[in-house]
Regions:
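Bacterial N-terminal signal peptides
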Residues: 9-19
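Conserved, mostly hydrophobic/aromatic
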Residues: 40, 60, 68, 85, ...
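Active-site acidic/histidine proton-transfer and metal-coordination neighborhood
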Residues: 66-67, 99-192, 277
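Acidic-and-aromatic substrate-binding clefts and catalytic sites of carbohydrate-active enzymes
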Residues: 45-51, 69-79, 97-105, 129-132, ...
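Bacterial N-terminal signal peptides that target proteins for export
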Residues: 1-11
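Acidic/histidine-rich catalytic cores of soluble enzymes
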Residues: 155-246
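Hydrophobic faces of well-ordered beta-strands that scaffold small-molecule active sites
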Residues: 36-41, 68-70, 92-97, 121-123, ...
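N-terminal pre-domain/capping segments
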Residues: 2, 22-120, 290-292
């Protein structure tokens, strides 16, 4: 009997030794704001992709990243790129391309996106003749977004995302051209991908934008702006003004909290700097240490 009691006591202690750390880890994970690895925008490693696509995919996989937003195919057929992704347990959720392709070659873009396994097609700029985006440009874009977005959704099961680049935040009526675009596109067919640097640089608060339009965002580009860079409405800044998340001007925790509250599912690191290989691991670590 004594032996059984001792044996049971030892067994209980052993089980506690194993289970308590598990409970502790679960409790800790509940306190973390961003415990998972983010996705990445292929533009981050553009020079690497241009030289060696398989090796660059290996770098991404070794960083613990699973989801990639591709902004181009780097000379490959989409089926070949998809095979490389599948072999590494990677996926492409967003396929990005330019205005002319999305608007005038919609079927080709949709076929490529479907082959890659993407859910979304990202469009990153609006053409304009003058130095600045005009209300007429924005109105034309809204009409085209609604038209193409409906086609992509009804014919291919894809969703169109518009990605801001700064000039959309010019004042217009009681808000900005960006407000006009969000408010006049059909949410059934058109959603948005918020690039937080290109919203912050012209004077916007990315977290406030998410809180204002919580149902319209499906993805974020996560990046930070060097501390000594003045904010401006030019829509331009040096690539090396991209710094490690948390080392710059943007309130990253506020952005992530707003995005979590809004239910945004896709987060892509986009580091445009020449130091991306060194900075991306640090940005990932920063995100993993964020507390609620």
């Amino acid at each position: 009997m004594k032996f059984s009691i001792v044996k049971a006591t030892v067994l209980t202690a052993a089980l506690l030794a194993v289970t308590l750390p598990i409970y502790k880890l679960k409790a800790q994970s509940k306190k973390l704001l961003f415990p998972e690895a983010p996705g990445i925008e292929s533009y981050t490693f553009r020079s690497n992709f241009t030289k060696d696509v398989p090796a660059t995919l290996d770098i991404i996989r070794n960083l613990g990243i699973k989801d990639i937003e591709f902004s181009k195919l780097y000379g490959l057929e989409q089926e070949a790129l998809r095979k490389m992704l599948d072999e590494r347990g990677l996926k492409c959720s967003v396929f990005g391309t330019g205005w002319n392709d999305v608007i005038n070659k919609t079927t080709e873009v949709a076929v490529a996106a479907k082959a890659l396994g993407a859910q979304y097609i990202h469009l990153g700029s609006i053409p304009h003749k003058g130095p600045a985006l005009t209300p007429g440009d924005a109105q034309n874009a809204v009409a085209e977004f609604n038209r193409v977005g409906k086609l992509l959704k009804t014919e291919y099961g894809l969703e169109l995302l518009y990605h801001n680049h700064g000039d959309e935040f010019a004042p217009y009526e009681n808000g900005t051209l960006y407000d006009y675009m969000v408010q006049n596109t059909n949410p059934e067919y058109v959603s948005f991908e918020l690039d937080i640097l290109w919203a912050y640089l012209p004077g916007m608060d990315p977290a406030r934008l998410i809180n204002t339009y919580p149902q319209r965002y499906k993805a974020l580009h996560l990046k930070d702006l060097k501390k000594d860079v003045a904010r401006n409405t030019s829509g331009k800044t040096d690539h090396d003004n991209n710094v490690v998340l948390g080392a710059g001007q943007i309130d990253i925790p506020a952005v992530i909290k707003a995005a979590r509250q809004a239910g945004i599912q896709h987060y892509y690191l986009e580091d445009e700097s020449s130091l991306a290989l060194e900075q991306v691991p640090l940005s990932i670590q920063y995100l993993k240490n964020l507390k609620k």
